[in-house]
Amino acid sequence: FPVDELLLFGSPNSAGRTYIFKGRDYEVKLLQENDDFRGVDVAFVSAGGSASKRYAETITKHGAVMIDNSSAFRMEDDVPLVVPECNAEDALNRPRGIIANPNCTTIIMVVALKPIQALSPIKRIRVSTYQAASGAGAAAMQELQEQCRQVLDGEEVKVDKFPHQLAFNMIPQVDVFTDNDYTCLLYTSPSPRDR
């Protein structure tokens, strides 16, 4: 990816860390709402949905295109949901200056299905996925680890981050439930016109 200048921003947990890119050290700066993104062409954001929503205006108000890796904007009609191999042209219509990408499972699936769709229109796909607890964040992973210990030690299992015990179990939930009892993840497709 061609880069003239690289700026790294992060949370208090990441601020101050140093990363090497093309032989040069870059320090992560603390992202704040008054940061100025003038002159920034593209901002890749992968800090979770709440951070994406909180800083979207800060990032885009001077023309930067925000490519968001969270679920924050996936259901928004005025934010294109793009998988470049399938619908790159949708990235050109971004009224809010934001481009979202679908869940990783969806991305892999639609890339594989695009050539089939070109040969014979697909009417419906039923998919079952098994998502990792890590997708729910560090606190959820800590809970899973603690639940595993509790089960193995014969202790009562404490549940906090998930609706049910996750250790040695599968629960029928991915993402946040909507009013019709489906989850947002079930609605992510590669194009807003197909949502």
Positions of predicted regions on the chain:
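Active-site pocket-shaping loop/turn-to-helix segments
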Residues: 180-186
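Glycine-rich phosphate/diphosphate-binding loops and the adjacent beta-loop-alpha structural elements
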Residues: 172-178
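N-terminal Rossmann-like NAD(P) cofactor-binding subdomain of oxidoreductases
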Residues: 1-166
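Single conserved hydrophobic/aromatic residue that forms the stacking wall/gate
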Residues: 187-195
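Short acidic, gly/pro-rich beta-turn/loop elements at beta-sheet edges
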Residues: 137, 178-180
